[in-house]
A protein has these predicted regions:
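Histidine-acidic metal/acid-base catalytic patches
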Residues: 1-201
Length: 201
């Protein structure tokens, strides 16, 4: 049986009971779908189970996370933070976080590094949204001020902060650069060989 859209997924999950939830795959929505609203609704209903992070354009629904629409990714995280905090959910463990990408023209490990960075950027930007001011703007129906608050956070360059966090954790300041300098791909090929079998599973 095919699940046609998020509404059908929510219906099935509701019928199956409290342990059944919906998975939101960012690439599997109609063009211009309000995914952040879908996320908010599923959270309100207690039926959001997790994510497949990716991006989509034309017929490709498994592009690098944040490569096409990073603003929407930020808005999704804004809804997640607000909704999860209201329900006292643990950001790290209470939802399933997965990257679902198909690496046809990129090194898959480099693509994963870029995807993780995009997720961290959107999450950090959403964390610095002035939630109290945004709530006040909403209560006053002040759409202009709400937009200003969201876009001020979105336009804040949090990459130096993330680099500092990596450095303090003993990780690379520039993961892609270090990956290339250390010839990680070459070493993995040497270790695993060049003969691979793709099963499609």
């Amino acid at each position: 049986m095919t699940v046609g859209d998020w509404g059908q997924s929510l219906l099935y999950a509701s019928k199956l009971g409290p342990k059944a939830c919906s998975l939101v795959d960012l690439g599997h929505h109609l063009p211009n779908a309000n995914i952040e609203q879908i996320v908010s609704l599923l959270l309100m209903e207690g039926k959001l189970g997790g994510f497949h992070f990716n991006d989509s354009k034309y017929g490709d629904d498994d592009l690098t996370v944040g490569s096409i629409n990073p603003y929407q990714l930020f808005l999704i995280f804004n809804e997640l933070i607000e909704g999860m905090d209201a329900r006292k959910m643990n950001h790290a463990n209470d939802l399933g976080w997965m990257i679902d990408a198909s690496h046809n023209v990129k090194d898959p490990l480099e693509d994963l590094l870029q995807s993780v960075e995009a997720i961290k950027i959107a999450y950090a930007q959403a964390l610095i949204v002035d939630a109290a001011a945004l709530d006040e703007a909403r209560q006053n129906n002040d759409v202009v001020q709400a937009q200003e608050i969201l876009q001020n956070a979105y336009r804040t360059d949090v990459r130096p902060l993330l680099a500092e966090a990596r450095m303090r954790a003993g990780a690379a300041l520039d993961p892609v650069k270090v990956f290339r300098e250390l010839n990680v791909r070459k070493e993995l090929v040497k270790e695993r060989g060049t003969k691979t079998v793709a099963t499609g599973l």
